[in-house]
Amino acid sequence: MDAAFVITPMGVLTITDTLYDDLDISIMDFIGPYIIGNIKIVQIDVRDIKYSDMQKCYFSYKGKIVPQDSNDLARFNIYSICTAYRSKNTIIIACDYDIMLDIEGKHQPFYLFPSIDVFNATIIEAYNLYTAGDYHLIINPSDNLKMKLSFNSSFCISDGNGWIIIDGKCNSNFLS
């Protein structure tokens, strides 16, 4: 696997094969160009973190997950450790409770939701709606379109105020 952005419930990360294995990431779905993944983790007591854990750990802050040796870590304003998680080969230290997604370096007020949230949409960014690879920006979508999108997708990305990014998972019968 080449480097890619993966959206997880803990935030967005750029992964390589090493990070993929360290965090035991499983790919769950795709929303257009975005990969939706899950990290297999178990919450641990912060007091159980050892010095040796810090040599190969990851930090989660403001919707982004980075390894401890990342240059991005210097830009994080980390004041406290909120919680910690153990993964397959490492730990993840969460430094805030913010679950906002940092997608492609643009800090946006978007969150990962089940596709049913499409019913709250007033604006939809739809990938793969009519044909594979297409993109559409739809203002005031019909209830019929929302229903079909909710059935075809498992997840959507939402700002919680009506802006939804979703994948139509097009096939030859979609919207016919």
Curated annotation (Swiss-Prot):
Q: Name one Pfam family in it.
A: Chordopox_A35R
Any idea which UniProt keywords this protein has?
Host endosome, Host-virus interaction, Inhibition of host adaptive immune response by virus, Inhibition of host MHC class II molecule presentation by virus, Viral immunoevasion
Induction context: Expressed in the early phase of the viral replicative cycle.
Q: Which residues form the signal peptide?
A: none
Instruction: Give the location in the cell.
Output: Host endosome
Could you tell me the Gene Ontology terms of the biological process aspect for this record? Answer: symbiont-mediated suppression of host antigen processing and presentation of peptide antigen via MHC class II
Q: Which domain of life is it from?
A: Viruses
The Gene Ontology CC terms held by the record are: host cell endosome
For the keyword Protease, the answer is no
Looking at the keywords, is Magnesium present? no
Please give the InterPro entries that the UniProt record associates with this protein.
Chordopox_A35R (IPR009247)
Summarizing the function annotation, the protein's role is: Mildly affects the expression of MHC class II molecules on the surface of host antigen presenting cells (APCs).
Can you tell me which family this protein belongs to? Answer: Belongs to the orthopoxvirus OPG163 family.
Q: What is this protein called?
A: Protein OPG163
**Species of provenance:** Monkeypox virus
